[in-house]
Amino acid sequence: MPDIRPHYFIGVPIPEGIANPIYQAAKNEPILTFQKWVHPLDYHITLIFLGAADETQIKKLEGSLAEIASEIDPFSIKFGKIDVFGDRRKPRVLHLEPKKNKTLDRLREHTKQAVLQAGFQVEKRPYHPHMTLARKWTGEDGFPAHVPFESGEVSMMAERFSLFQIHLNQSPKYEEIFKFQLS
């Protein structure tokens, strides 16, 4: 029987003023032929995917996340290259990568420890921070070696991270349930 509990993740939301221009530039680039484009209000950098959870588990995690937020100052995130996950001939995911960022890595590690202590499982795959832009390549040729789309010097201040609930049949589909202001 499928688990009907809501699904959640923890992530850093991308401000609308950053998300909208990225969305327009990527979606209007003719060589980026993907079937499903992520709504710009859903742009985020995932820290941890939690999966199905009940209210008790979420409440248990909330206090730990608030404590983490009080220990980390707001920080700048600079975005680098656009890239894909999956076979380059038919990639699954188009994403924008943030440049290496020690504070983002620290936030992820602290969040991971809190999630484990709250009894959640954490994916064993290596962590690759990214902002998903689109899914399901539809091009006839593979993903190009050079993409003229440039994020330029796109940067943002990460002033909070959030616990998101996923609503699969809505658009936008991610709802910020709890916001944790960095201090």
Swiss-Prot record:
Its EC number is 3.1.4.58. The active site is at 44 (proton donor), 130 (proton acceptor). The keyword Hydrolase applies. Keywords: Hydrolase. A motif (HXTX 2) lies at residues 130-133. GO terms for cellular component: cytosol. SUPFAM superfamilies: LigT-like. It comes from the Bacteria. It catalyses: a 3'-end 2',3'-cyclophospho-ribonucleotide-RNA + H2O = a 3'-end 2'-phospho-ribonucleotide-RNA + H(+). A motif (HXTX 1) lies at residues 44-47. The keyword Hydrolase applies. GO terms for molecular function: 2',3'-cyclic-nucleotide 3'-phosphodiesterase activity; protein kinase A regulatory subunit binding; RNA 2',3'-cyclic 3'-phosphodiesterase activity. Hydrolyzes RNA 2',3'-cyclic phosphodiester to an RNA 2'-phosphomonoester. Belongs to the 2H phosphoesterase superfamily. ThpR family. This is RNA 2',3'-cyclic phosphodiesterase. It comes from Bacillus subtilis (strain 168). The lineage of its organism: Bacteria, Bacillati, Bacillota, Bacilli, Bacillales.
